[in-house]
Amino acid sequence: MSSPIKIAVTGAAGQIGYSLLFRIASGALFGGDTPVQLRLLEITPALKALEGVVMELDDCAFPALDSVEIGDDADHIFDGVTLALLVGARPRSKGMERGDLLSANGAIFTAQGKALNRVAADDVRIGVTGNPANTNALIAMSNAPDIPASRFSALTRLDHNRAIGQLAAKTHARVGDIRKMTVWGNHSATQYPDIFHAEVAGRNAAEVVNDQDWIENEFIPTVAGRGAAIIEARGASSAASAASATIDAARDWLLGTPEGDWVSMAVASDGSYGVPEGLMYSYPVTTSGGNWEIVEGLEVNDFSRRKMDATAAELFDERAAVANLGLI
């Protein structure tokens, strides 16, 4: 076996955490031959529940699970980690304004960014799943000045996977036949899942679908509104699918994207495709050796331009809001 990889997960006793930890421990992220050390962060009142989760992890006897440590102190849990999955976030409660949500999460991700800056491994990679993910990632990144901005990413892989599922259903294809899906922008209702560069069994997806009305009025709203639809159906938010997407995103980031394909990741914009620099914006990317690169040179039609600009504008406003709160 290779040397153990130290992985931190925040919000580890939550619903997504519960789905995520057993996948990581079973080898879904790095394979069964790479041992993992789980470092699990929770708020103090949730530590008792987290102890129960650790009991279950012990009872699974996963060969790849080297050790588990839990705690409520970020500096202790993040010490020496090479991968930090920031899953825990303050959910929006009834009557809460968006500004209140940004402020509450700002305090969480400011503290975690500073702790990662102090104690994480030099080669750390940080993926943010907790919502609002793009802006939470921006806050953490802004509070970790010694960690390169390229080491931070927010999760839009769930939207990417949802888009693949919807396109596969529409075209009667297998999900494995679909490549080059793109989700632009924010993990929110303004996101833009784009099939104009996607392929279905090697053919252009938009040409296979040949239905602009479906793209505009069914596909995009279904993908963007999927989280709300799941809450309506099961009475709780997406957990297993969010955990699965978190695994997919981390695996591809660290181990590389398949040849001839790309994935969607929210990363710090360098101005590509006219997006303001510094926004945590979802792009099509290829990855290799733990590094990502934005896919450049894609043709953007007028419809796509409007959608891409609208989601950028929302992120710009979110950045301004957290700047006004003194969080970045």
Curated annotation (Swiss-Prot):
GO molecular function per UniProt: L-malate dehydrogenase (NAD+) activity
Keyword Transmembrane in record: no
UniProt cross-references to Pfam families, sorted A to Z: Ldh_1_C, Ldh_1_N
Catalysed reactions, semicolon-separated: (S)-malate + NAD(+) = oxaloacetate + NADH + H(+)
SUPFAM superfamilies registered for this protein in UniProt: LDH C-terminal domain-like, NAD(P)-binding Rossmann-fold domains
InterPro entries: L-lactate/malate_DH (IPR001557), Lactate/malate_DH_C (IPR022383), Lactate/malate_DH_N (IPR001236), Lactate_DH/Glyco_Ohase_4_C (IPR015955), Malate_DH_AS (IPR001252), Malate_DH_type2 (IPR010945), NAD(P)-bd_dom_sf (IPR036291)
Binding site for NAD(+): 11-17, 105, 112, 129-131
Active-site residues, as the UniProt record annotates them: 187 (proton acceptor)
Top EC category: oxidoreductase
GO BP, sorted A to Z: malate metabolic process; tricarboxylic acid cycle
EC number of this enzyme: 1.1.1.37
PROSITE patterns: MDH (PS00068)
Binding-site list for substrate: 92, 98, 131, 162
Transmembrane segments: none
Keywords noted in UniProt: NAD, Oxidoreductase, Tricarboxylic acid cycle
Similarity field: Belongs to the LDH/MDH superfamily. MDH type 2 family.
HAMAP family: Malate_dehydrog_2
Job of this protein: Catalyzes the reversible oxidation of malate to oxaloacetate.
UniProt name for this protein: Malate dehydrogenase
Naturally occurring in which organism (per UniProt): Paenarthrobacter aurescens (strain TC1)
